[in-house]
């Protein structure tokens, strides 16, 4: 099975095109204004319009107002929504696009129970828990906390980079991996060399 790759926190058209050229299946745009990787829906639209076919454009939100989600869907031309806060299942499924639900993993959290609440999601994204930081922390979590029988496709995130993505895939067996800080030169500025190295790491995992 080919592991899908999403490069998140895109703010520049050249970074999006580099990611896609190097093999990424999806690019993520952070519509949370407190993030250093924030981009406006209009700016995201300018990037989305340059992408080739069959590349998924993902809008990332943290406890947004419904109107903001609707506006960004309309303006940016998204394909998929990613909710990274404490949004309820009812909130997530009210929109015109499919969604994935992110959860920050820590000991004691029942991931099977959590996943059972979001049966309408197309995937469950597992990220690292850091107090006050919804994502993009650059820190990995203990992959041993991931149950083998998650009922939703697993998207692995949290501190992934070229040096650990092969072992992460071997251990967690995800449907997809999501990377942001691990391929950056600075927050919101991607490094094509790091993206290329990350993609090689994904490729190695598929050959083992």
Swiss-Prot record:
Q: Which UniProt keywords are present, listed alphabetically? A: Amino-acid biosynthesis, Aromatic amino acid biosynthesis, Isomerase, Tryptophan biosynthesis
Q: Might you give the EC number(s) for this enzyme?
A: 5.3.1.24
Q: Does the keyword 4Fe-4S apply?
A: no
Q: What class of enzyme is it?
A: isomerase
Instruction: Give the Pfam families listed for this entry.
Output: PRAI (PF00697)
The UniProt entry's GO biological process terms, in alphabetical order, are:
L-tryptophan biosynthetic process
Which pathway is this protein engaged in? Amino-acid biosynthesis; L-tryptophan biosynthesis; L-tryptophan from chorismate: step 3/5
Kindly give the InterPro entries that the UniProt entry links to this protein.
Aldolase_TIM (IPR013785), PRAI_dom (IPR001240), RibuloseP-bd_barrel (IPR011060), TrpF_fam (IPR044643)
Q: Which domain of life is it from?
A: Bacteria
The UniProt family comment states: Belongs to the TrpF family.
Q: Which NCBIfam families match?
A: PRK01222.1-4, PRK01222.1-6
Official protein name in the record:
N-(5'-phosphoribosyl)anthranilate isomerase
Give me the gene this protein comes from: trpF
């Amino acid at each position: 099975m080919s592991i899908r790759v999403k490069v998140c926190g895109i703010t520049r058209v050249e970074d999006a095109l580099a990611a896609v050229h190097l093999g990424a299946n999806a690019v993520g745009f952070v519509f949370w204004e407190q993030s250093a990787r924030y981009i406006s829906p209009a700016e995201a639209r300018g990037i989305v319009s340059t992408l080739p076919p069959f590349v998924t454009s993902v809008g990332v939100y943290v406890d947004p107002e419904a109107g903001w989600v609707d506006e960004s869907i309309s303006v940016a031309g998204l394909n998929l929504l990613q909710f990274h806060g404490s949004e309820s299942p009812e909130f997530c499924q009210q929109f015109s696009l499919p969604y994935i639900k992110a959860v920050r993993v820590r000991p004691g959290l029942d991931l099977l129970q959590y996943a059972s609440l979001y049966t309408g999601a197309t995937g469950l994204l597992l990220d690292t828990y850091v107090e006050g930081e919804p994502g993009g922390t650059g820190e990995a979590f203990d992959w041993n906390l991931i149950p083998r029988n998650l009922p939703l496709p697993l998207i692995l995130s949290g501190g992934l980079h070229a040096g650990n993505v092969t072992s992460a895939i071997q251990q967690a067996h995800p449907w997809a991996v999501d990377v942001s800080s691990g391929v950056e030169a600075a927050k919101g500025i991607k490094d094509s060399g790091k993206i290329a190295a990350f993609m090689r790491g994904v490729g190695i995992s598929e050959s083992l």
